[in-house]
Amino acid sequence: MNHLTAHKREYTRNRGNLYLAFELGSKEWKLGFSVGFGQRPRERVVWAGDLVGVRREIERAKKRFGLSGEVRVLSCYEAGRDGFWLHRYLVHLGVSSLVVDSSSVEVNRRARRAKTDRMDLGKFVSMLMRYDNGERKVWSVVRIPTAEQEDSRQLHRDLVAL
């Protein structure tokens, strides 16, 4: 076994983590689950804001991948109109959550294909695994404001909109 093979085996080994990427839409949320590189993510859909559905799908994914109930769950989603309440809920569930600056997500400029949720979920899950394996330049993680800071920002946005 040469150095590159050894590195690849180490990089793709399942360390017992469940990775979860969200694609947040206005009507539905798409969830992509994986336990390691080299596999397509398990994709599920819940209604937007359905926290019971999110929790249920996390538990189903643990069972599907044969993971214990106490397995480390890492999640990510792009910062946007939904704010940070989803992050707070996930942390409350014991999920390690990252909110990603959408402008920092790498894009293949040569690709002449449309952006789709399926590509986004697969890419997000892969990038989350890369980030977890120490590749910090994959994207920029947003600093999470306190609930009070977020509320004051929202009040300001509402006043500007009027």
Stretches with model-predicted labels:
Residues M1-L162:
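Phosphate- and other anionic-substrate recognition elements at nucleic-acid/protein interfaces
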